[in-house]
Structures are given as structure tokens and as C-alpha cells.
């Protein structure tokens, strides 16, 4: 039995979230009656409202009065008034991943998982399949610039989704094709141990059907080890590793883009295909790897080399993934979602390879628990930044942890040899700190998953006003 086509209103609690908004948008496009609420009036809420979806700002019990079904994200607490009301009314309450899984049953599906790179890789897979006239439905964890949204309804047989592993619910997703970009210690508050995380990814791959396949990055040692523990499923490996089935070769990172070639070697004797002079208009070795994963899927699904080449060259990127917000005095300013040490290091490495000037990092640490559990990694992931400006921790609802804060991170950076790590007391002080350091050709990179994105977009104007 599949999700009935005729349901009463489906109410999303937290509809403005990046994952929830995409599901809501696709369901509305499928003809379901969709509504929802969010604590804040954000861009996603406004976009859904403009598309005819009824939205409420603020959570109130009366918002679910006419609902037949309620969808919740993991961010919604048990004491939410709408959730309490839904349960008092005995309404079905569905987790976000469960509803995504229901949508996936309508299509053949590619699910993109991994600690880092999911959103960009999902966007790249969607772009390449679109170029191959497969017209996929897409539900992503970020705004795809070419679409202006994180979701689109396609008429083709394929769906491409970002598989969020943070609460383990990605194991509910019925994928035909699975991508694993990397596996690092993250979300330990849910999983309890790194071994539990690795086991979850193994089960994610085991879930694909015998006629499907997994695309896995063997440059990452944990993923390479996982490949050795997968039985009875088809695996396509990718990476710079000489043993990879889809091998990334000769990366040239200059001028804010990546040039490379890819060699595809099937396990069939004698099969070999080389794609020369590929161009991706994004900097960074990590993005070239993401493109290689997408290329592996597209090639397997029959997309031509010419379509792949043109789609990569025309890729418009993803919002909050090394997004240029403006410039001042010849220095470029960027916004990036990176908030894990591995992500931060990759972004700063990409920035370093793209400019002859200095790299100035502005970071807003996200969650006390993350800073605590990965403290040593945070203290060493800024090596490619000439200056690190550290803001107070964005708590995301957490209580402070003694000895884990902005100042302890600055002390840790300096203790490990960083030459210029400074504190940001207030967002209003950022322009002054940057203006005293930024010169022509420098990159100012704002990093974090909290409110720092607002600072990144405001900074060019604030610098201009300061100069005046």
C-alpha cells in the first residue's frame, strides 16, 4: 500500500527547515494539501507561501485543528504545543525521514549520504541527470542556485535525495543507488560511538536492492574499510586512489575552479573510458571528488559524456557553499556552511588554492557539544587561514559547557602555533576587524551553521560604510 492520494491537510511542524520545506514543496506539487508552521518567518517559509502553501509563523495548538496528518523534524521538542495537540487528537505523527521514504516509493532513487559533501553532491547528481534528460525529482539539504529552491518536481522516473544520517533515520530510505562520500565522527550525541556510526552506514548500503549499486569514496580510509565489509551488493568505488573504479586524475585548482580528468575502469576485462579536460566552476579538491561521485552515477545511468561535460561546466553551485556575497577594496567575501573541522579545512584549502592573497577566516562555532568532542580538530583545521576571527559559540539550544567557548578555541589555536587568532565580541565589530586586515586579492571566508550567514551578506555593505 502506498501513500493515499486523497488525504486531509498534511501539517508540517517546522516547515521552514531545509529538509522539511523540500518535502512539503514536492508533496504540494504532487497534489496533496500541505500546510505548516515554523517558529520564524524565513526565506523557505516565504517561498512556500508564495507557492500557495498555507503557512503559520509561530507554533500554536489551533494550527493543527484541520490536519489529518502531522510531520515533524528531529528539531521539534515533545513539549511543542502543536505536537501535543496532534497527539491528543490521535493524529498520525510522522518523522521527516518516514515521509521522505514514502515519497521515494514513487520513483527509482539515488540517496546521497556521508558526513560532508552531501548537499553539493546531491546537487551535482541532479544537474547531471537533468542534463541527460532524465528530469529527476530532487529533495536537497540546500538551495540549488539553478533552481532557486531545494526541491523540484520532475517528470522522470528518478528521484535524487540528500540522506541525513544525523539521527539514524536515513536507514528508512529505500534507495536504489547509494552514495557515501566520507564517514567521520559526528552526531555522537545520537549514535553514542564512532563504531555505531560506521555500522549505520554499513546497514545503509545493505539496504539497497540487489539490482542497485553503491558509489563509495575509497580515498577515505573508513569508507575503504567499509567497502571490504559489504557483501552481495554491487560497489563502484571512486577517488584519487589508483584502485578506484572511477578515478579522479590531474586536478588543477586555479582561479576559483577545478580542472581534472576522470578514468572509468569497469571490473569487466578491457573496459576503460577516459573523460579529459573536465571543468567544475567551484574550487577545491573536495568538490572535484563530489563531482566524480556524481559523474559515476550519471555514467552508470546512461548519461552521455558530452552531457556530463556541459553540465559540470555550467554547474551553478549551492547556496552557502563557498558563496560569494560581495567584495570590498579588492577583497572577496564568501559565505560557507562549513561547521565541522573537516569541512572547514577543505573550504580554507580551496580558498588558499584560489587566490594569491591572504585567507581571513571568520568562524561561529556551532554547538558546545561539537566544539567539545572535536576540540583538537578545531584547533588544527585553520592552518590555511592567515587570520582566524572567532565569534561566540552559536548554542543551537544547548546549555554552555564550562571551559568550552570562543576564548578556549582561540587559546587552543595559539597554543598550536596559529599566528593570528582574535576574538569577535559582537557582530557589529566584524567590519572593523576585517578592514584592518583585508587587502586586494584577499579572501574573507565566513564559516558556520548559525547566524553567521547574515553577517556574511551584510559585511560588504558594512565595510563600505566604514570606509566612508
Curated annotation (Swiss-Prot):
UniProt keyword terms in alphabetical order: ATP-binding, Cell cycle, Cell division, Cell shape, Cell wall biogenesis/degradation, Cytoplasm, Ligase, Nucleotide-binding, Peptidoglycan synthesis
Biological process terms in GO annotation: cell division; cell wall organization; peptidoglycan biosynthetic process; regulation of cell shape
UniProt: ATP binding residues: 114-120
Coiled coil: none
Reaction catalysis annotation: UDP-N-acetyl-alpha-D-muramate + L-alanine + ATP = UDP-N-acetyl-alpha-D-muramoyl-L-alanine + ADP + phosphate + H(+)
Disulfide bonds: none
GO MF annotation, one: UDP-N-acetylmuramate-L-alanine ligase activity
EC numbers for this chain: 6.3.2.8
Annotated localization: Cytoplasm
Location (main, coarse): cytoplasm
GO cellular component: cytoplasm
Pathway assignment: Cell wall biogenesis; peptidoglycan biosynthesis
Function: Cell wall formation.
UniProt xrefs under PANTHER family: UDP-N-ACETYLMURAMATE--L-ALANINE LIGASE, UDP-N-ACETYLMURAMATE--L-ALANINE LIGASE-RELATED
Family, per entry: Belongs to the MurCDEF family.
NCBIfam families, per the entry: murC
Name recorded for this polypeptide: UDP-N-acetylmuramate--L-alanine ligase
Upper lineage: Bacteria, Pseudomonadati, Pseudomonadota, Alphaproteobacteria, Hyphomicrobiales
